[in-house]
From Swiss-Prot:
CDD domains: IgC1_L. The keyword Transport does not apply. Disulfide bonds join 28-87. SUPFAM superfamilies: Immunoglobulin. Gene3D superfamilies: Immunoglobulins. Its main location: secreted. Immunoglobulins are composed of two identical heavy chains and two identical light chains; disulfide-linked. It is found in: Secreted; Cell membrane. GO terms for molecular function: antigen binding. This is Immunoglobulin lambda constant 2. Displays the following serological isotype: Mcg-, Kern- and Oz-. The Mcg- isotype marker is characterized by Ala-6, Ser-8 and Thr-57; the Ke- marker by Ser-46 and the Oz- marker by Arg-83. The keyword Secreted applies. The gene is IGLC2.
Length: 106
């Protein structure tokens, strides 16, 4: 088998175009992990978020490692009413957390 590989996690905030369209989607990209099982948890400030979360099934990349993504759908009001949002990825017992914060100006 191949060695375990920890995922690299990137968290993207909603785009300004999206906010102008009265939508807000956070995207958490998880890539280069092996084996292909991850758990994704979202948090607003420090409270868990369950609603509006959609996580894809990990798919195998060309390098035989896995990639997945998780989406959190919010309203712009929800997005702006918290200090930060976090995407927590747990893989093989270790957790990677990435956080984005809404900027005041948009």
């Amino acid at each position: 088998g191949q060695p375990k590989a920890a995922p690299s996690v990137t968290l993207f905030p909603p785009s300004s175009e999206e906010l102008q369209a009265n939508k807000a989607t956070l995207v958490c990209l998880i890539s280069d992990f092996y084996p292909g099982a991850v758990t994704v948890a979202w948090k607003a400030d420090s409270s868990p978020v369950k609603a509006g979360v959609e996580t894809t099934t990990p798919s195998k990349q060309s390098n035989n490692k896995y990639a997945a993504s998780s989406y959190l759908s919010l309203t712009p009001e929800q997005w702006k009413s918290h200090r930060s949002y976090s995407c927590q990825v747990t893989h093989e017992g270790s957790t990677v957390e990435k956080t984005v914060a809404p900027t005041e100006c948009s």
